[in-house]
C-alpha cells in the first residue's frame, strides 16, 4: 500500500518552496483551486490541476499538477509571477515522510526484501538507507540531477527534481520519530517584474523496470532481483512481452508459468518417472530391510543392486527439481 495517513502509519509525500522567499518556510502554504472536482474524462489523456496562492499581492505562485492516463508519474511545476520590484528567490523541496511500520508485501517466500529509502549520486548509482541507518545518523549529499525515494517489495515512491541542477538529498529522523527522505533544489530565482518556473516529478506506483529507466538514470536499480538476477531479468522481459500482446497482467503471469512449465517438461517427466519407479519398488526395499536388519553394509549393497536391476536412479526425482528450483524461486 502506498501513501496513507493514519495513526502510526504515516506515509506522505510533500513538496513546496523554502528559502529566502519560500512560502512554506513557516508551515504549509494555503492554495486555492478554480474547481472543487477534477476528473480525467473519457478520451482525455492529460489532466492539469492548478493551485494558486498570492504573496503580498505582488507575487503569485501557481502549483501545477499534471496527471496522465495510465501513468504513475506526476509532473509538478511551480510557476512564479513576480510583479514586485525586487528579485524573488527560493528553493524547491520534495520529501517523503514515513513512520517505521512494516510492509506486508516485503516478506516473500524466500526472505525479507529491502524496506527503506533509496537514492543515487554520481559516485554511487544506488544507495539504500534503512531505518536503522537513519537512527545512527542523518546523511546528506549533493549531486547533479538525482532522485530520492522509498522502496518496498513491489512498489516505489520517488521524487525526481530538476535533472540539470545540483540538488541536495537528505535522509533524517525528527523528534517525533518520523523518517524523511528529501531533496532541496538549487536556487530558483525570478527577476523583478518577470515570470519563472521550475518543474519536478513524483512517481508512486509499481516497480516497472522499463518505465523507471525512462524516468531518470539509475531509477530502475530500485528493482532488486537479488542473487538470481540473471534469471529474474529475462523472466521479467518475457512477462512484459506477453503482457504487450495479452493486455492483462494476471493472464500474462498464468501464460508465463505455462511457458516455463513447457520448457521444463522433459525434466519434469524424468522426475515423475523416477518417483513412480521408487514407489513401485517400495515393497522390495522393505523386504531387503527386513532381511538385512542391522547389517548396514549388506543393506546398502542389496539396495544398490536393486536400483541397478530395476534401472532406477534414486536421485532422478531430486536433480530435475534442483535445476528448476532457482527459476521458480524467481517466479514467486
Tell me the role of every PLM-derived stretch:
Residues 1-221:
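Soluble non-transmembrane domains of integral membrane proteins
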Residues 78, 90-111, 151, 179, ...:
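Helix-loop-helix
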Amino acid at each position: 500500500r502506498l501513501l496513507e495517513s493514519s495513526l502510526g502509519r504515516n506515509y506522505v509525500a510533500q513538496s513546496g518552496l523554502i528559502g529566502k522567499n519560500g512560502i512554506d518556510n513557516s508551515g504549509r502554504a494555503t492554495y486555492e483551486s478554480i474547481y472543487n472536482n477534477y476528473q480525467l474524462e473519457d478520451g482525455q489523456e492529460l489532466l492539469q490541476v492548478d493551485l494558486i496562492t498570492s504573496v503580498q499581492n505582488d507575487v503569485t505562485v501557481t502549483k501545477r499538477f499534471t496527471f496522465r492516463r495510465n501513468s504513475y508519474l506526476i509532473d509538478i511545476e511551480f510557476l512564479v509571477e513576480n510583479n514586485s520590484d525586487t528579485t524573488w528567490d527560493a528553493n524547491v523541496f520534495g520529501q517523503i515522510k514515513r513512520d517505521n511500520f512494516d510492509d506486508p508485501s516485503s516478506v516473500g517466500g524466500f526472505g525479507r526484501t529491502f524496506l527503506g529509502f533509496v537514492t543515487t549520486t554520481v559516485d554511487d548509482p544506488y544507495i539504500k538507507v534503512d531505518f536503522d541507518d537513519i537512527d545512527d545518523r542523518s546523511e546528506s549529499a549533493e549531486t547533479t540531477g538525482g532522485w530520492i525515494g522509498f522502496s518496498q517489495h513491489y512498489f516505489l515512491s520517488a521524487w525526481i527534481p530538476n535533472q540539470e541542477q545540483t540538488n541536495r538529498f537528505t535522509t533524517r529522523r525528527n523528534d517525533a520519530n518520523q523518517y524523511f527522505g528529501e531533496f532541496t533544489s538549487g536556487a530558483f530565482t525570478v527577476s523583478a517584474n518577470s515570470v519563472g518556473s521550475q518543474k519536478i516529478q513524483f512517481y508512486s506506483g509499481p516497480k516497472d523496470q522499463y518505465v523507471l529507466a525512462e524516468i531518470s538514470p539509475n531509477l530502475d536499480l530500485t528493482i532488486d532481483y537479488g542473487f538470481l538476477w540473471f534469471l529474474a531479468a529475462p523472466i521479467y522481459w518475457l512477462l512484459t512481452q506477453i503482457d504487450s500482446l495479452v493486455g492483462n497482467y494476471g493472464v500474462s503471469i498464468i501464460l508465463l508459468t505455462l511457458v516455463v512449465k513447457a520448457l521444463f517438461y522433459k525434466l519434469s517427466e524424468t522426475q515423475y518417472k523416477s518417483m513412480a519407479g521408487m514407489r513401485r519398488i517400495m515393497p522390495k526395499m522393505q523386504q531387503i530391510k527386513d532381511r538385512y536388519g542391522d547389517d548396514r553394509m549388506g543393506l546398502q549393497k542389496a539396495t544398490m543392486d536393486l536400483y541397478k536391476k530395476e534401472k532406477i536412479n534414486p536421485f532422478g526425482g531430486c536433480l530435475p527439481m534442483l535445476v528448476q528450483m532457482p527459476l521458480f524461486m524467481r517466479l514467486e
